[in-house]
Swiss-Prot record:
Protein name listed in UniProt: Oxygen-evolving enhancer protein 1, chloroplastic
Subcellular localization, as worded in the UniProt entry: Plastid, Chloroplast thylakoid membrane
GO CC aspect terms: chloroplast thylakoid membrane; photosystem II oxygen evolving complex
InterPro entries found in the cross-reference section: OMP/PagP_b-brl, PsbO
C-alpha cells in the first residue's frame, strides 16, 4: 500500500504553458482537510515563483491523497488481501458475526505444527471434516488467436465464494506398504460454479467429488462421479434440449464434412453423469489430533449446455480429520 501511495503522490513533469493548471479535490478528502469540494487549487505562471511552487505542491498532495482514498474505497475489503488461514479450533472459537463477511467460511482449516509426513499406522479409520478448497480454475479451450491449439486458460470467477466442499466423510483404509484407500460417502460434495474465459465465454460446471474412490500412496492417491449441472428439460439458446425442445436448430446439417461428431455433441443433449479424476497429496499431518492437510488437482468435464463439455482443471488445498475405528 505504501508503494501505491508513493506512486499516487508522484508528480510527472509537464510541459509549461500559458494556461493555468487546476486540481479539484474529492469530497471525502476535502471534508478531511477542511476544503470546499467545489473549490479549485490553481497554479499560474503569473504568480511569484515560490507561490507557484507551494500551490503546485499542495495540489499534487491533494491529488495524491484523493487518488489513494479512491483506491481504498473501490478495493474495499480486498485492500488487506485474503484472510489469514486459521486452524480448526480457531474457527470453532469464533462467533457467526466474527466470521461473517471475512471469507473464512470459504476456507479449509490449516494445521499448527505437525510433521511433513503421514505417520498413521496401518488400520481402518474414518475420515471426517474432509474439506476441498479450490485456489484456481482453468478451462481447456481454444485460444483467442486463430489456429491456436486448445490449452488450459486462466478464468475469472463469476459466482460467489461458495465453491468450497466441506463436511465430507467416509472410510479410510491404511494398508501395508503405506497405501491408502478412501471412499467418499456423505457431506457437501458438490458446488455450482461458473467461470469466464478471457474471450468472454462462460463455462458452468459442478465442482464435485461424488462417489470418490481414491487409492494410492500418501504422496498421490486418487475417479469420481460428476452429476449433470442442468436437468434434461433445459433448453439451450437455440431451443435444443434433452427431453424437450428441438433435436436440431433449423435444418439437418449436411454430412460428409468431417464435423459430424462435433455437431452431434451440440445437437444431441445428454443429462447423464460423467466422470472426473482427482489427485490428492498429503503435505503435513498432526498425529496427536488426527489432522491431515495437503494439495489436490482435479480434472473434470464442464456442463455448459448438456453437451460439448470442456475440461476444467481445479487446483487447491484440502483438510481432513482421521479417527481410528
Amino acid at each position: 500500500m505504501a508503494a501505491s501511495l508513493q506512486a499516487a503522490a508522484t508528480v510527472m513533469p509537464a510541459k509549461i504553458g500559458g494556461r493555468a493548471s487546476s486540481a479539484r479535490p474529492s469530497s471525502h478528502v476535502a471534508r478531511a482537510f477542511g476544503v470546499d469540494a467545489g473549490a479549485r487549487i490553481t497554479c499560474s505562471l503569473q504568480s511569484d515563483i515560490r507561490e507557484v511552487a507551494s500551490k503546485c505542491a499542495d495540489a499534487a498532495k491533494m491529488a495524491g491523497f484523493a487518488l489513494a482514498t479512491s483506491a481504498l474505497l473501490v478495493s474495499g475489503a480486498t485492500a488487506e488481501g485474503a484472510p489469514k488461514r486459521l486452524t480448526f479450533d480457531e474457527i470453532q472459537s469464533k462467533t457467526y458475526m466474527e466470521v461473517k463477511g471475512t471469507g473464512t467460511a470459504n476456507q479449509c482449516p490449516t494445521i499448527d505444527g505437525g510433521v511433513d509426513s503421514f505417520p498413521f499406522k496401518a488400520g481402518k479409520y474414518e475420515m471426517k471434516k474432509f474439506c476441498l478448497e479450490p485456489t484456481s480454475f482453468t478451462v481447456k479451450a481454444e485460444g483467442i488467436q486463430k489456429n491456436e491449439p486448445p490449452r488450459f486458460q486462466k478464468t475469472k470467477l463469476m459466482t460467489r465464494l461458495t465453491y468450497t466442499l466441506d463436511e465430507m466423510e467416509g472410510p479410510l483404509e491404511v494398508r501395508r506398504r503405506r497405501t491408502l484407500k478412501f471412499e467418499e460417502k456423505d457431506g457437501i460434495d458438490y458446488a455450482a460454479v461458473t467461470v469466464q474465459l478471457p474471450g468472454g465465454e462462460r463455462v458452468a460446471f459442478l465442482f464435485t467429488v461424488k462417489q470418490l474412490v481414491a487409492t494410492g500412496k500418501p504422496e498421490s492417491f486418487r475417479p469420481f462421479l460428476v452429476p449433470s449441472y442442468r436437468g434434461s428439460s433445459f433448453l439451450d439458446p437455440k431451443g435444443r434440449g434433452g427431453s424437450t425442445g428441438y433435436d436440431n436448430a433449423g435444418a439437418l446439417p449436411r454430412g460428409g464434412r468431417g464435423d459430424e461428431e462435433e455437431l452431434a455433441k451440440e445437437n444431441v443433449k445428454n443429462a447423464s453423469s460423467s466422470t472426473g479424476n482427482i489427485t490428492l497429496s498429503v503435505t503435513k499431518s498432526k498425529p496427536e489430533t488426527g489432522e491431515v492437510i495437503g494439495v489436490f488437482e482435479s480434472v473434470q468435464p464442464s456442463d455448459t449446455d448438456l453437451e460439448a463439455p470442456k475440461d476444467v482443471k481445479i487446483q487447491g488445498v484440502w483438510y481432513a480429520q482421521l479417527e481410528s475405528n
